[in-house]
C-alpha cells in the first residue's frame, strides 16, 4: 500500500476497505488463533478447512482472529453468513461443517455449545451465557479481524479516532476528553489516565515518551496479551492519541519475551503502520511525529513496576527506585525525560472514547469506575477465559452467570482477585460489585484483572502459601522488608502446611504482613502480604485447624490428620498397602487398617485409593465419633456451623432458654439438627447424656 500523506487520504482508504473487505453474504470463517486456541489445534483446523474447501471447489474466506474469549472450549470459530458459533472444533469436523453449514444451511449441531448434554445447544455467539452479559470495549475487535492485516483494522473503522483528533481536536481537547471520561488505569492502581496525561504534558522539555506496560506477570492473567495478539493496532492508535495529547515523539511497548505471538503481531502492526504513514515523521502531513518500537523484557515480575520497567528499557537491571521524581517529571522517566506509562488495556480504551465521547464512556459502569474491565476468569469454574464486563457487575454474575458456576457442581469457597498481590474473598461477598473502590474496601484489589475461583476442595492456607512463594521468588531484593519479610512469612506458611505450625504463628504472620506493607519500597512488596492477610481475615478457622488441630479440612496439606479406612467402601484391592513406604497399612484376615503409630500422613494411600475409602479425620473428633456413634461428617458440620470447637461446646453451660432432656440419644439429636441445617450447641453431663441443645 502507498503511504498516505494527508487526512483525506486516510478517510478515502478506510472507506474503500469498508466496501471491499468483509463483504456480506460470502462464506467466511473467523477462527481463533490466540495462544490458547493455537495450543489446542486451531492451525490444524485451518488446514482442514482449506483442504475441504479445495476438494469441494468452494471458496471460503478464512480470518485468523485473536482470542475470542471462551478459551476453555477452544479451538472456537464463527461461520458466516449465518453466524454459527462452534467450539472444540477438530480437523476431522471440517467435513461436517461444510455439509451442514454451507450446503444444507443448518448448524453442525455436534460443534455447538450447550450447557449440558440434555439441553438444547446455542447457535449464535451472542446467545451463549458466557457472552450474553459481556460488553466489549477493550476487546471490541478481538475475534473479528486478522491482527496481522491493517486492512482489516481500517475496514472496521480503525484509526478513525486518530483522524478525528488530528483534524478537529487540539492536544488540550484530547487530554480534557480523557479526563472527563474518568478513564482509570487498568493496570491495578486505578489512577485516572487523564490526570496522568496532563501532568506529563505540563512537564518542561521537548522530548517526552509514551510507554505501554505489557509486562503482564500475574499467574493465570492474559488480558493484555490477548489485546496485543488480537488487536495490536488498537493499542498503537491509543498510544498515538496519547503522544499527540502530551507532545511526545517517541514510544515503547514493553512486552515480556514469553509472549512470542504478541511480540510478532506487534512488530508486524508497527511495520504496516509505518509503511502507511501512520507512524514515523510528519504523520498524515500534520507535522505530528511519533516513533514506536517494541522492547522485550526478561520476564521478571518486578519489571511491571513503573520505575523498574523504565530501568529495564534503559538496559539496566529492573530495580524499583524511590519517588519522586515521578515518571511524568524531569529526571523520572526514560533516560530522565518525562514519560507517560499506562497498561495495554488502558490505551485500547482511548480510541472509542475519542470517537464516541466521554459521556458515552461514563454511561457504562459506576460513577467512580466508568467503563468496562477485562478479567481472566480461571480456576474451578466451568467456563474459563477472557470476559469483559461493565464495572459494578457482581462477583456472582461473573462467576455463575458468565462462568457457568463451579466445576463438578461443588461448593464455591472463595475468589482471588488481583493476582498474587490481591486478596481472597469468601462466599459472603459474592454480591459485591466489582470496581476499584469496592474491592479495595474489603481487603482485595482489582489488579490487572486476574480472577481465580476456588472450590470447597481448596486449602486457603495453601493458596496463601502459593501466592506468597511467587512474590517472594520475584522480589528484586532491594529493600529488607520485602526481601527478608516475605522470606520469613513464607517459612511460617510452609511450616504450617507441613503440620509443624506453632501457637503464635498466626499472629506472627499478621505482624510481619503489616510491617512489609508499611516498609516496602514498591508496590510489589507493599501488596505481597495481601493474600495471607485476607485469608487470615476471612478464613482464620482454617489456619487455627492447621496449627491447633494439625488438620487440613480440604485434605490438601500433607503431614496432617488421622488416616482411617472406611471399611464400608473398601474393595480390598490392596493398593494402599502397596504404596505405603512406612508399612503403616496392615492387612487382617478380612480388612485393611492403618496403624497411626507408623503413619506419616504422606497421603500416598489417600491419592491411590480408587474408591475414596481412605478418610482423613480431625483427631479431636474421633473420640466423640467412637463414644456417641455420631457420623463424623455431622460432627464436622456442627462444629463449623457453630464456629466453636466441640470441646468449647461441651464445656459451655445451657442458657435459660434451652429445653433440657435426659432420655435423648446424642446421635439422634445430631441427625435431626444436621438435617435441618441448624448450627447448634450440644451440652452433655459427665455421663455423656445430652442435657441441652
Feature roles, as predicted:
Residues 73-78, 481-487, 575-593, 604-622:
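Iron-sulfur cluster-binding cysteine motifs and their immediate structural context
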Residues 163-204, 362-363, 368, 373-377, ...:
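Accessory "access/gating" subregions that flank catalytic or transport cores
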Residues 238-242, 391-409, 669:
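Short amphipathic, charge-patterned alpha-helical segments
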Residues 3-27, 42-64, 81-113, 161-178, ...:
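Ferredoxin-type iron-sulfur electron-transfer modules in oxidoreductases and energy-metabolism complexes
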Residues 620-693:
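Tandem CBS (Cystathionine beta-synthase) repeat/Bateman regulatory domains
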Residues 133-134, 263-391, 403:
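Hydrophobic alpha-helical positions that pack around
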Residues 110-180, 334-337, 342-357:
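Flexible inter-domain linker/hinge segments
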Residues 36-38, 178-200, 299-311, 472-484, ...:
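Conserved phosphate/anionic-ligand binding catalytic regions in large, soluble enzymes, centered on
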Amino acid at each position: 500500500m502507498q503511504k498516505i500523506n494527508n487526512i483525506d487520504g486516510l478517510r478515502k482508504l478506510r472507506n474503500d476497505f469498508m466496501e471491499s473487505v468483509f463483504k456480506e453474504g460470502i462464506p467466511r470463517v473467523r477462527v481463533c488463533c490466540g495462544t490458547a486456541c493455537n495450543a489446542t489445534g486451531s492451525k490444524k483446523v485451518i488446514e482442514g478447512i482449506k483442504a475441504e474447501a479445495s476438494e469441494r471447489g468452494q471458496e471460503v474466506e478464512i480470518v485468523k482472529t485473536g482470542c475470542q474469549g471462551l478459551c476453555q472450549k477452544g479451538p472456537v470459530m464463527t461461520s458466516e453468513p449465518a453466524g454459527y458459533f462452534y467450539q472444540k472444533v477438530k480437523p476431522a469436523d471440517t467435513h461436517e461443517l461444510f455439509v451442514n453449514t454451507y450446503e444444507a444451511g443448518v448448524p453442525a449441531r455436534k460443534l455447538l455449545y450447550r450447557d449440558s448434554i440434555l439441553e438444547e445447544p446455542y447457535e449464535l455467539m451472542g446467545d451463549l451465557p458466557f457472552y450474553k452479559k459481556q460488553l466489549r470495549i477493550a476487546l471490541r475487535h478481538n475475534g473479528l479481524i486478522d491482527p496481522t492485516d491493517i486492512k482489516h483494522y481500517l475496514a472496521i473503522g480503525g484509526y478513525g479516532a486518530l483522524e478525528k483528533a488530528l483534524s478537529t481536536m487540539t492536544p488540550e481537547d484530547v487530554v480534557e476528553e480523557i479526563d472527563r471520561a474518568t478513564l482509570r488505569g487498568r493496570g491495578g492502581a486505578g489512577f485516572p489516565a487523564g490526570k496522568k496525561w496532563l501532568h506529563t504534558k505540563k512537564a518542561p522539555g521537548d522530548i517526552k515518551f509514551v510507554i505501554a506496560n505489557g509486562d503482564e506477570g500475574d499467574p493465570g492473567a492474559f488480558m493484555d496479551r490477548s489485546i496485543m495478539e488480537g488487536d495490536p493496532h488498537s493499542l498503537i492508535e491509543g498510544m498515538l492519541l496519547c503522544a499527540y495529547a502530551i507532545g511526545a515523539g517517541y514510544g515503547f511497548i514493553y512486552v515480556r519475551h514469553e509472549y512470542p505471538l504478541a511480540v510478532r503481531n506487534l512488530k508486524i502492526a508497527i511495520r504496516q503502520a509505518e509503511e502507511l504513514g501512520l507512524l514515523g515523521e510528519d504523520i498524515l502531513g500534520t507535522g505530528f511525529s511519533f516513533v514506536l518500537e517494541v522492547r522485550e523484557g526478561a520476564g521478571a515480575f518486578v519489571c511491571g513496576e513503573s520505575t523498574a520497567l523504565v530501568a529495564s528499557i534503559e538496559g539496566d537491571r529492573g530495580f524499583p527506585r524511590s519517588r519522586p521524581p515521578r515518571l511524568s517529571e524531569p529526571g523520572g522517566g526514560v533516560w530522565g525525560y518525562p514519560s507517560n506509562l499506562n497498561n495495554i488495556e488502558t490505551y485500547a480504551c482511548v480510541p472509542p472514547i475519542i470517537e464516541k465521547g466521554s459521556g458515552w464512556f461514563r454511561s457504562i459502569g459506576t460513577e467512580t469506575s466508568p467503563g468496562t474491565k477485562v478479567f481472566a476468569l480461571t480456576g474451578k469454574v466451568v467456563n474459563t477465559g477472557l470476559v469483559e464486563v461493565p464495572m459494578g457487575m457482581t462477583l456472582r454474575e461473573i462467576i455463575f452467570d458468565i462462568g457457568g458456576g463451579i466445576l463438578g457442581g461443588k461448593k464455591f469457597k472463595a475468589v482471588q482477585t488481583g493476582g498474587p498481590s490481591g486478596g481472597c474473598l469468601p462466599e459472603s461477598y459474592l454480591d459485591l460489585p466489582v470496581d476499584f473502590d469496592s474491592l479495595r474496601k474489603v481487603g482485595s484489589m482489582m489488579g490487572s484483572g486476574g480472577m481465580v475461583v476456588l472450590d470447597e476442595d481448596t486449602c486457603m492456607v495453601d493458596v496463601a502459601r502459593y501466592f506468597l512463594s511467587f512474590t517472594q521468588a520475584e522480589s528484586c531484593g532491594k529493600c529488607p522488608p520485602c526481601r527478608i519479610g516475605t522470606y520469613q512469612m513464607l517459612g511460617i506458611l510452609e511450616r504450617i502446611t507441613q503440620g509443624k505450625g506453632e501457637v503464635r504463628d498466626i499472629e506472627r504472620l499478621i505482624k510481619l504482613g503489616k510491617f512489609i506493607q508499611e516498609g516496602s519500597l514498591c508496590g510489589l512488596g507493599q501488596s505481597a502480604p495481601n493474600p495471607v492477610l485476607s485469608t487470615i481475615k476471612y478464613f482464620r478457622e482454617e489456619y487455627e485447624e492447621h496449627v491447633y488441630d494439625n488438620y487440613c479440612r480440604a485434605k490438601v496439606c500433607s503431614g496432617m490428620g488421622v488416616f482411617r479406612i472406611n471399611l464400608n467402601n473398601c474393595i480390598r484391592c490392596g493398593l494402599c498397602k502397596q504404596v505405603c513406604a512406612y508399612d503403616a497399612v496392615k492387612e487382617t484376615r478380612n480388612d485393611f487398617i492403618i496403624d497411626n503409630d507408623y503413619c506419616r500422613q504422606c497421603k500416598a494411600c489417600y491419592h491411590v485409593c480408587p474408591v475414596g475409602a481412605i478418610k482423613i479425620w480431625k483427631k479431636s473428633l474421633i473420640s466423640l465419633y467412637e463414644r456417641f456413634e455420631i457420623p463424623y461428617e455431622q460432627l464436622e458440620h456442627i462444629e463449623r456451623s457453630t464456629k466453636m470447637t466441640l470441646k468449647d461446646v461441651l464445656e459451655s453451660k445451657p442458657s435459660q432458654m434451652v429445653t433440657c432432656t435426659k432420655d435423648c440419644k446424642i446421635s439422634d439429636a445430631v441427625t435431626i439438627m444436621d438435617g435441618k441445617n441448624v448450627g447448634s450447641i450440644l451440652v452433655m453431663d459427665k455421663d455423656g447424656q445430652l442435657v441441652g441443645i
